[in-house]
Curated annotation (Swiss-Prot):
UniProt function note: ATPase required for the correct placement of the division site.
Residue ranges of coiled coil: none
Name of the protein described by the UniProt record: Putative septum site-determining protein MinD
Cellular localisation: Plastid, Chloroplast
Length: 269
């Protein structure tokens, strides 16, 4: 039976969907059958970030209405057969799928996959509550900015109130030089405020923009960028592996391939 993890954030624009795409692909590369559920109805982007937008024929909404079978709506990634996407409808609003319907979709998938990752709409409105309904665990994505952290704190409280106790923190778009100059909150600052376990730290890098524009998750790179390696490590931590966090202050791009072999084994290259 699958682990059901919702990827959420308080504030929009913190990179939540990028996180979902890369964690999903990384888990699939680790050998886990992984299904990604785009719950951001009306504003779907997960298909774009995975490069699957031209293959969307049916969405979750057609499954719920009986217009198609679940298997017809699921899109299998040709680069990684362990990964499938259930896309959201683009021309509907967030109220089009209820919490009970989201639970129904998850129940259709839960016995056939090892991981279900739900890409949750930003904010705390109806779409958020519908998306977190089926989840057992949550990853809260924030950037090290005070507004994003404050919104993340609010989301953590709502997740706990809805019975989700396994909540992890992912700090995205960290700029080590700005932290060093005291112009950005450090990871320690964010952890002190939010008081939940840290699962990942992803540095800011222009390669992330290139990756999203191309529809190619960073973890597919043969020679991993620093963010790509950080995403792989995050997936391994989600899987229960103990992996030290990278020292982003002093890290250079040169040893990435060597470190990847050390942490993940040559079979993942």
């Amino acid at each position: 039976m699958a682990r059901i993890v919702v990827i959420t954030s308080g504030k929009g624009g913190v990179g939540k969907t990028t996180v979902t795409a890369n964690l999903g692909m990384a888990l699939a590369q680790l050998g886990y059958r992984t299904a990604l559920i785009d719950a951001d109805i009306g504003l779907r982007n997960l298909d774009l970030l995975l490069g699957l937008e031209n293959r969307v024929i049916y969405t979750a909404l057609e499954v719920l209405s009986g217009e198609c079978r679940l298997e017809q709506a699921l899109i299998k990634d040709k680069r990684q057969p362990n990964l499938v996407l259930l896309p959201a409808a683009q021309n509907r609003n967030k109220d089009s799928v209820t919490e009970e319907q989201m639970k129904f979709l998850v129940n259709l998938l839960v016995n056939d996959y090892d991981y279900l990752l739900i890409d949750c709409p930003a904010g705390i409105e109806t779409g958020f509550h519908n998306a977190i309904g089926p989840a057992q665990e949550a990853i809260v994505v924030t950037t090290p900015e005070i507004a994003a952290v404050r919104d993340a704190d609010r989301v953590i409280g709502l997740l706990e109130a809805n019975g989700i106790k396994q909540i992890k923190l992912l700090v995205n778009r960290l700029r080590p030089q700005m932290v060093k100059a005291n112009d950005m909150m450090s990871v320690a600052d964010v952890r002190e405020i939010l008081a939940i376990p840290l699962i990942g730290v992803i540095p800011e890098d222009e390669c992330v923009i290139v990756s999203t524009n191309r529809g190619e998750p960073l973890v597919l790179e043969k020679n991993l960028s620093l963010p790509g390696l950080a995403f792989e490590h995050t997936a391994c931590r989600l899987d229960g592996q103990e992996i030290e966090f990278l020292d982003l202050q002093s890290y250079s791009r040169g040893p990435l391939k060597r470190l990847r072999r050390f942490f993940l084994g040559s079979s993942t290259n």
